[in-house]
Amino acid sequence: DKGLPYEELETSLVRSEAEVLIFDTEHLAAVEQLRAAQTTKVSTFICMDASADYVSVAQLRSEAKQAGEAELARYQALPIDAKALALIIFTSGTTSLAKAVMLSQYNIVENVYALQCCENVYRGDVNMAFLPYHHTFGATGQLVMLAAGAATTYCDGLKYLQKNIVEYRISVFFCVPLLIEAIYKRIMMTVKKEGLERKVRFGLKLSGLLLRCGIDIRRKLFKQILDQLGGNLR
């Protein structure tokens, strides 16, 4: 979380016994403070940007290219324990210290598989990443998109949400219930303003009844509303 206070960042690094920290220059002050404090086990600092004082991601990438095929093959042949600890996620910790959720690669892949069993995501779908990737649901949703071969676009901000959905012709959207409720309320506000509430509510009942009989006319019935959301949203 880029907005994490320094104290929580330090505590998380201590509790996780992290040895490597990847950061960007925006958080350089916090990194310098961590190095000076020497309260964590972090011994390797990797900067995502070019830096005279730290190893950069570009530098590591360059070294990897120079290592040669033999070194790459050795790395790729390393044994993987799918059920060993691979990820520690700290919860929000609103009432006390953040709880550390311990996950394995098996847990993560199982989540991706389960989501694909619940919802159909296809190659060619377009997703909009709205939740940050340090948000577990946001990160898992992105892994689902990669697994399915779907494209991912990025929202320009909450005020541009509807504009981006239309502009990018979004077909799949992973988000929290609160955001869906906000979109629904906004749609219903427009429906009431245009005097179409009774017509829409009747359409909802009719389409629900027909759906039970295996007839789906929702996209035709609510085309005008769906067009306001880009026309592709499922």
Where are these regions (language model features)?
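Conserved S/T- and glycine-rich ATP-binding loop of Class I adenylate-forming
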Residues: 21, 85, 91-94, 127, ...
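Conserved acidic residues
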Residues: 10, 19, 43, 83, ...
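Structural core segment of the AMP-binding/adenylate-forming
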Residues: 1-63
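Conserved AMP-binding/adenylation subdomain of ANL enzymes
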Residues: 109-126, 133-224, 228
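Conserved AMP-binding A3 loop
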Residues: 86-112
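Short hydrophobic/charged patches on amphipathic alpha-helices used for structural packing
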Residues: 10, 77, 89, 162, ...
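Residue-level detector of structured alpha->beta connecting loops
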Residues: 17, 39, 149, 169-170, ...
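Conserved pre-ATP/AMP-binding loop-to-beta segment of ANL
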Residues: 47, 52, 67-90, 97, ...
